[in-house]
């Protein structure tokens, strides 16, 4: 049977076909009126169609410019010259500026630059110091505040600039924005950092005191390709076998003597050696930590995070910290948060091994960025005029707007650990419930650094070919005897968990130091175990990442493990599961259990780790449970 197209759709097609070129408002109204007169059968159709046409076609009929490209250079305060590409409208007048400072080659910003310039922005993409066409030496984070300040003020003074400068981009490009913002250049008017960190020790290089080995090795190797004119491709390819390294061969990084380090590291990535030399949160890190400088940020910020991103925890802390401690009312009240499904390299409908439905594919980073600056710089009343927080809720697989983050209505709920025999592997009897434990046995396992628990998915970067990120079936890990498993019964109704997740763990070890890992998992009726979020804590940093404190073997300690955040509806019939172990390799380096620096140690010992869950040691997973509307 032939289906008739709705009147609104036919009208939209006619008007937008006629109005391929920019039209004035009165012309649009006339065309819309005429089309409605032809196709609308009643007043309701007329009103609906006219509203649809005007809202949609006004967007398409916004002034569009031809774009010119030119190359420019600017001198920093110390005399170093940085080079940039400038995309701008071929028109007289002055326009707001959107600036990106990147270590990944300025030619990579073309797609957004052309789109934004055609929409009435001057777009500047600059190679940061020591990268590609810019002069100087690249050293992570060190020059980004001063160079960012100088570049913003140079951009604001260009003859075609109206004096308003915004910044955009993700990962290290997000870091260049944050580090520029804490220097508060007068003409910086907004930033849009995407998937970036808040602390370059505890959310970039380390987590819970453990070294982010996979990210740091793969990212550093990728950066070195430009530094050495891409001749170190063989080093990048070698990463493919990193997880198969001889696990009993030590030391892993023999860099205590710089002459012992590989030449490719000392000459191409000297910062890597410094990261290893500063395992604690000391002044080396504090001077560049965004968390230490929230009060210096004076501009509105759109923070874009992703549930499976390697910097998710830091992105959310940026939003919370600037909203609470920003240096101006405009900053505190101008915070917006957008949390997508996906990982560090982007999103889409299918992430890892999970299909999140058509709504997941709606996110477009370039579109969101442009809307943010249309709202901020041009006063366009778009989605950013509404609630400040927008998140993707997994399980329900839909977007939702919120008043704030974390959600005020989320109820902190303790799910206590239980077992009657032993919770080791899927063959054990570990369980989770809201009932507090009384008298129960302990659970134990042996952690052998030569046989670590392998990383399967999760927040990974930057070599997806060899170590695919995102949600993946965790059953291979859960079959191991050195992984403790605690599960709820199948839920009788949909249960939402949205917000920060943590684990209060009472445990002891036979070693002076070890790691404890935790992973939150959604288990479907078919057994598929989808990882949601995870965390790690190196025992020596249980009190503070600023100072190491070894354990007394056999003594019970309380450990608090930060699993970052999630938003997931555990559907009816699904189970919620917690995995506990002592390694997640090669995402994190292995703790050798000796108390030595893992990067330099030559020996290792196995550790027998014991988890307590009784009345005196109520180990519990703390979840933000959200009641349905």
Question: How does the language model describe each region?
Answer:
Residues 313-334:
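Active-site-adjacent alpha-helix of alpha/beta-hydrolase-fold enzymes
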Residues 62-90:
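N-terminal cap/lid segment of alpha/beta-hydrolase-fold proteins
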Residues 303-305:
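Short beta-strand/loop motif that positions the catalytic acidic residue
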Residues 118, 182-296:
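Accessory cap/linker subdomain of secreted extracellular hydrolases
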Residues 160-171:
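Alpha/beta-hydrolase fold nucleophile elbow
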Residues 93, 97-156, 349-356, 585:
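Cap/lid segment of the alpha/beta-hydrolase catalytic domain
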Residues 242-259, 353-629:
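C-terminal, loop-rich substrate-recognition/catalytic regions characterized by aromatic stacking residues
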Residues 170-179:
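Glycine-rich nucleophile elbow surrounding the catalytic serine of serine-hydrolase chemistry
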């Amino acid at each position: 049977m032939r289906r008739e197209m709705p009147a609104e759709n036919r009208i939209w097609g006619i008007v937008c076909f006629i109005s391929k070129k920019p039209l004035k408002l009165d012309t649009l109204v006339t065309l819309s009126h005429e089309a409605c007169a032809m196709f609308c059968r009643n007043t309701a159709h007329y009103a609906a169609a006219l509203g649809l046409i005007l809202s949609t076609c006004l967007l398409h009929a916004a002034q569009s410019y031809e774009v010119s490209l030119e190359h420019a250079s600017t001198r920093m305060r110390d005399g170093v010259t940085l080079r940039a590409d400038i995309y701008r409208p071929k028109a007289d007048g002055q326009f707001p500026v959107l600036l990106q400072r990147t270590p990944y080659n300025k030619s990579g910003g073309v797609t957004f630059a052309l789109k934004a310039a055609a929409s009435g922005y001057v777009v500047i993409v600059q190679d940061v110091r020591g990268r590609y066409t810019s002069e100087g030496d690249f050293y992570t984070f060190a020059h980004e505040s001063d160079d960012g300040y100088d570049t913003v003020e140079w951009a604001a003074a260009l003859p075609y600039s109206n004096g308003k400068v915004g910044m955009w981009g993700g990962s290290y490009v997000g870091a260049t924005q944050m580090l520029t913002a804490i220097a508060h250049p007068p003409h910086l008017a907004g930033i849009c950092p995407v998937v970036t960190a808040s602390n370059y020790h505890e959310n970039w290089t380390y987590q819970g005191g453990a070294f982010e080995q996979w990210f740091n090795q793969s990212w550093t190797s990728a950066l070195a390709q430009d530094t050495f004119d891409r001749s170190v491709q063989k080093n990048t390819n070698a990463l493919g076998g990193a997880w198969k390294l001889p696990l009993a061969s030590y030391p892993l990084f023999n860099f205590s003597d710089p002459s012992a380090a590989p030449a490719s590291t000392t000459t191409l990535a000297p910062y890597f050696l410094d990261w290893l030399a500063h395992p604690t949160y000391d002044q080396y890190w504090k001077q560049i930590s965004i968390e230490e400088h929230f009060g210096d940020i004076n501009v509105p910020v759109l923070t874009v995070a992703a549930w499976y991103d390697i910097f998710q925890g830091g992105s959310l802390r940026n939003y919370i910290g600037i909203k609470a401690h920003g240096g101006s009312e405009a900053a505190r009240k101008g915070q917006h948060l957008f949390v997508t499904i996906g990982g560090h390299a982007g999103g889409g409908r299918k992430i890892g091994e999970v299909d999140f439905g058509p709504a997941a594919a709606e996110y477009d980073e370039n579109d969101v960025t442009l809307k943010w600056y249309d709202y901020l710089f041009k006063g366009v009343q778009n989605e950013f005029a509404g609630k400040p927080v927008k998140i993707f809720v997994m399980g329900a697989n839909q977007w939702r707007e919120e008043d704030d983050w974390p959600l005020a209505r989320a109820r902190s709920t303790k799910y206590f650990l239980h077992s009657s025999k032993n919770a080791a592997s899927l063959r054990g009897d570990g369980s989770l419930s809201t009932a507090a434990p009384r008298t129960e046995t302990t659970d134990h396992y042996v952690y052998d650094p030569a046989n670590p628990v392998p990383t399967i998915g999760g927040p990974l970067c930057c070599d997806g070919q060899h170590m695919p990120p995102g949600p993946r079936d965790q059953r291979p890990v859960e079959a191991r005897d050195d992984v403790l498993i605690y599960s709820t019964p199948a839920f009788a109704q949909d249960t939402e968990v949205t917000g920060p997740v943590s684990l209060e763990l009472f445990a002891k070890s036979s070693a002076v130091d070890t790691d404890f890992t935790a992973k939150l998992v959604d288990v479907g009726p078919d057994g598929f175990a989808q990882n949601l979020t995870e965390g790690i804590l190196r025992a020596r940093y249980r009190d503070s990442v600023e100072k190491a404190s070894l354990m007394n073997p056999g003594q019970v300690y309380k450990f608090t493990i930060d699993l970052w955040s999630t938003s997931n509806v555990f559907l009816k019939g699904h189970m919620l599961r917690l995995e506990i172990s002592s390694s997640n390799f090669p995402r994190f380096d292995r703790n050798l259990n000796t108390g030595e620096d893992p990067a330099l140690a030559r020996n290792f010992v196995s550790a027998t780790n014991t988890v307590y869950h009784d009345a005196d040691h109520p180990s519990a997973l703390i979840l933000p449970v959200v009641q349905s509307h």
